[in-house]
Amino acid sequence: MDTQSTPTLHDLPFRAADFSTLSEALDYAAQGETGANFYTGRGEMYATLPYAELRTSARVLARKLLGMGLEKGDHVALIAETNPEFLQFFFACQYAGLVPVALPASIKLGGHAAYVKQLSGLLKSSQAVIAMAPEGYLTYLEEAGEGLGLRMIGTPEAFERLPAADVAFPESDAEDVAYIQYTSGSTKFPRGVVIRQRSVMSNLAGIIRHGVKIGPGDRCFSWLPFYHDMGLVGLVLVPVASQTSVDYLDTREFAMRPRQWLNLMTQTRATISFAPSFGYDLCARRVRPRDLETYDLSNWRIAGIGAEMIRPETLEHFAEIMGECGFDRRAFLACYGMAETT
């Protein structure tokens, strides 16, 4: 992977998600220079993944998955940690005609046992055939998958060692299943919702054209988890479908160092970023007077807010403090998303 971040400005003619499938969207984005960039909690970029490289690696991985004897429509469970490998597996499934299922990369209250129980329930309900987890989550996933008959549970490195099949990719169209998105589970156990290519592409077009009105010069930034609607649809798929570069900070790193969000918004000159109310509240409470001198948030034109109750006092507090750094309170944009309505 490159060590220089992907550019904001580029020469590829802009298209606002006017594609039939996600793989078609990536095929087009890969003709340009934009892509995804990943940062540590200390604000250092550790990986960059141009869409051209994402396409190449996803297609290689897709042939490895097909080499396992998987068939079109089989479900692939993916622990959705914020890293390049998740993007590669998600789009490998698109090319291979498989259905990715993003699973949470968070150990909630209750620790090991509760997380394993949660994963086990999700693996069962999703009817996954294989499952991938980064090294730090592998033991949890292996324990959760015991007795479920999965063909393989492994790390990205383990899947990379598989032989590739010399086969043509299956035909895909707008009626194919793109992925399975689990509901938030706010009131009961999360429910898997089947998202078809036609639905997700329509949703992406609406967001790009009418929601945030993305255009040349825009750049996205996100610390949202890849297994939630706002993170996956809004800040993974929207950038691909609009040929827009995006910068990522892991959710856990944000929770430990919330000011890094503002540092990286300043550094990357991102124009679009979303968060629930608590994200804005956490930043406003943690920021120090001396920090304000180092921020320049004048580029931030869309500050999306949603996923939980929107509290006006939280937004007012954030806008008042960050106004010193060039933040425009008119950037706030309420958003609403549900897996059931994608």
Describe every region a protein language model picked out.
Residues A80, V101-G121, E135-Y137, T244-M265:
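ATP-dependent adenylate-forming carboxylate-activation enzymes
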Residues N83-K108, G121-I130, D218-R219, L237-D247, ...:
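A short helix-loop-beta submotif of the ANL/AMP-binding
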Residues M201-R219, D229-T271, R286-R290:
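Conserved AMP-binding/adenylation subdomain of ANL enzymes
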Residues T34, L162-Y182, K188-F189, S199, ...:
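Conserved pre-ATP/AMP-binding loop-to-beta segment of ANL
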Residues N37-Q88, K108-Y115, E171, I195-R198:
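Conserved AMP-binding/adenylate-forming core of the ANL superfamily
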Residues M1-L49, E53-M68, K72, A96:
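N-lobe entry segment of adenylate-forming
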